[in-house]
Amino acid sequence: MPTITIISYFGFLLASIIFTLVLFISLSKIQLI
């Protein structure tokens, strides 16, 4: 099942990117205040 592995990999990568963006935005808001 290579397809499931690829989907899981991209899903994990997307989650990591979203988590990084949320963390970066949170830090930016804290600095603005």
From Swiss-Prot:
| Positions of transmembrane segments | 4-24
Question: What protein family is recorded?
Answer: Belongs to the PetL family.
Q: Which gene encodes it?
A: petL
An annotated GO cellular component? chloroplast thylakoid membrane
Q: What is its main location?
A: plastid
This protein is called: Cytochrome b6-f complex subunit 6
Q: What subunit structure does UniProt give?
A: The 4 large subunits of the cytochrome b6-f complex are cytochrome b6, subunit IV (17 kDa polypeptide, PetD), cytochrome f and the Rieske protein, while the 4 small subunits are PetG, PetL, PetM and PetN. The complex functions as a dimer.
Please tell me whether the keyword Transport is annotated for this protein: yes
Entry function: Component of the cytochrome b6-f complex, which mediates electron transfer between photosystem II (PSII) and photosystem I (PSI), cyclic electron flow around PSI, and state transitions. PetL is important for photoautotrophic growth as well as for electron transfer efficiency and stability of the cytochrome b6-f complex.
Subcellular localization: Plastid, Chloroplast thylakoid membrane
Q: Which UniProt keywords apply?
A: Chloroplast, Electron transport, Membrane, Photosynthesis, Plastid, Thylakoid, Transmembrane, Transmembrane helix, Transport
In the UniProt record, does the keyword Transport occur? yes
GO molecular function annotation: electron transporter, transferring electrons within cytochrome b6/f complex of photosystem II activity
